[in-house]
Amino acid sequence: MARTKQTARKSTGVKAPRKQLATKAARKSAPVSGGVKKPHKFRPGTVALREIRKYQKTTDLLIRKLPFQRLVRDIAMEMKSDIRFQSQAILALQEAAEAYLVGLFEDTNLCAIHARRVTIMTKDLHLARRIRGERF
């Protein structure tokens, strides 16, 4: 289309209402109830950082009590058939196990950071255990 020269026009002082685009008008008048709302997507790492802050604040046990209790009893049954546990003994075992695992994962994370990575791998876990003096 060829360009045309625009001429100046006198203003009447009243602005004419602008026409909305067809898509905007259709979007506003369309009922929302028919569509399914998409769940909110967080950027990668946002949820992970939120979980890290949450678990660093709390002192609760991270492993569920009953599955841990079943595991302890199962291991104990392999050693001796008739053995009983006080609930406080299982709780103490769980506290110690979780403290050990948290410390091990901290050391594993340091090994990954030393290798200039942010993702922990099995080789980091092996290195952390070897440095601690545990055989692997």
UniProtKB/Swiss-Prot annotation:
Q: Does DNA-binding appear among the keywords?
A: yes
Its biological purpose: Macronuclear replacement variant which replaces conventional H3 in a subset of nucleosomes. Nucleosomes wrap and compact DNA into chromatin, limiting DNA accessibility to the cellular machineries which require DNA as a template. Histones thereby play a central role in transcription regulation, DNA repair, DNA replication and chromosomal stability. DNA accessibility is regulated via a complex set of post-translational modifications of histones, also called histone code, and nucleosome remodeling. Functions redundantly to H3.4.
The induction field says: In contrast to major H3, constitutively expressed in both growing and non-growing, starved cells.
Q: Which InterPro entries match?
A: Histone-fold, Histone_H2A/H2B/H3, Histone_H3/CENP-A
Gene Ontology cellular component?
Answer: nucleosome; nucleus
Write out the entry's keywords from A to Z. Chromosome, DNA-binding, Nucleosome core, Nucleus
Post-translation changes: Acetylated. Acetylation occurs almost exclusively in the MAC.
Instruction: Name the SMART domains on file.
Output: H3 (SM00428)
- Give one GO molecular function term: structural constituent of chromatin
Family as reported in the entry's similarity comment: Belongs to the histone H3 family.
Subunit structure and binding partners? The nucleosome is a histone octamer containing two molecules each of H2A, H2B, H3 and H4 assembled in one H3-H4 heterotetramer and two H2A-H2B heterodimers. The octamer wraps approximately 147 bp of DNA.
Protein name per UniProt: Histone H3.3
> What compartments host this protein?
Nucleus; Chromosome
Q: Region labeled Disordered — which residues?
A: 1-41
